[in-house]
Amino acid sequence: VHWSAEEKQLITGLWGKVNVADCGAEALARLLIVYPWTQRFFSSFGNLSSPTAIIGNPMVRAHGKKVLTSFGEAVKNLDNIKNTFAQLSELHCDKLHVDPENFRLLGDILIIVLAAHFAKEFTPDCQAAWQKLVRVVAHALARKYH
């Protein structure tokens, strides 16, 4: 994947302002609420019976932070995303059996969360760069499935 200097700047510039704990928790909670079938991968998280329960669930919050922290590795390694996510791809494929479509869904949700948090800065150019990034990350995570 080729990244222009502008794309790299738009991604890293915004990432430096992201509150990983808050945005990660919100992104995972939204995934579980908007796409309820994804909840089956989180049965050990306890109460996921309503949007309020999901948003207030400390395990959702903690895992959301973990997911977005991991996503930050893509930002740091834009030129080597495939290798950066090789082990996570293996884990999600072989052990967790996560449908790779869920990676794309979470990427789309992350775009919505970033747009909500950074409305003015999240210009169409910024969105295009981030959309490209979430697609590349989703593809890297799905790599083991192919």
Curated annotation (Swiss-Prot):
Gene3D superfamilies cross-referenced by the UniProt entry: Globins (1.10.490.10)
Positions annotated to bind heme b: 63, 92
Biological processes annotated in GO: hydrogen peroxide catabolic process
UniProtKB keywords: Heme, Iron, Metal-binding, Oxygen transport, Transport
InterPro entries: Globin (IPR000971), Globin-like_sf (IPR009050), Globin/Proto (IPR012292), Hemoglobin_b (IPR002337), Hemoglobin_oxygen_transport (IPR050056)
Source superkingdom: Eukaryota
UniProt note on tissues of expression: Red blood cells.
Pfam family of the protein (one): Globin
Domain (Globin) ranges: 2-146
Record function comment: Involved in oxygen transport from the lung to the various peripheral tissues.
Family of this protein: Belongs to the globin family.
Protein name: Hemoglobin subunit beta
Source organism: Stercorarius maccormicki (South polar skua)
Encoding gene, per UniProt annotation: HBB
